[in-house]
Amino acid sequence: MRPSEYICLCILSAVCSLAVSPTIVAAFPTNTQHDKPSRNAEQRTAMIHDLFTFSSADTVVAWSATDDRVMGGISRSRMRFYAGGYALFEGVMSLEQNGGFASVRAAVKPPPLAGVTHYVVEVRGDGKRYKLSMRTAGRFDAVSYQSTFATVADTWTTVAIAVNTFVATFRGRRVIDAPPLDAAKVNQVGLMIADGQDGPFQLAVRRMSVEAQ
């Protein structure tokens, strides 16, 4: 192969690799509080706004549980603070009595950034799947925009979830004619476990933020 042909192939390969990007951008190990996940050049230039940094006990006061007990189930959950600098979403999810979800939520001010592209969470999970949820209406029982993310058991990870992956739902069912999530109108954020994953669960959360380009 001539040098010029090799260079052309390299350029073509690079262009193709840039054309595909995952919807959930990354899950980087961050095994200590001071580790920072490596990002590509585009991500490093993003503007970041923290929604929650769980550095003190008062940071979890605004969070409240909403479990399947509202529909006759027996699941239970809570959000509590740990002195290590994180909050813990924990409880027991049960499928009995037509149940099947546990969640916590908190009011939040819309981010002062235009063009939000991702929601970012620093978490230590138990290997189960969780949902990050957003609401834009002021009502308690309103459309919820949800996106699912995986966790790695006993390992701190940073997960960036693209805004365009959030799906509109109402009482567990998809809302087909709902508009896309508008990050500028989000006034409530939540965490949920569902999808038949019964049993005890624990999700430690150190930080929740938004990114904008």
Question: Predicted regions span which residues?
Answer:
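Bacterial N-terminal signal peptides that target proteins for export
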Residues: 1-11
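Short, low-complexity intrinsically disordered segments enriched in A/P/G/S/L with frequent Arg
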Residues: 4, 16, 38-41
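Bacterial N-terminal signal peptides
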Residues: 9-22
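Beta-rich carbohydrate-recognition modules and glycan-binding surfaces
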Residues: 24-213
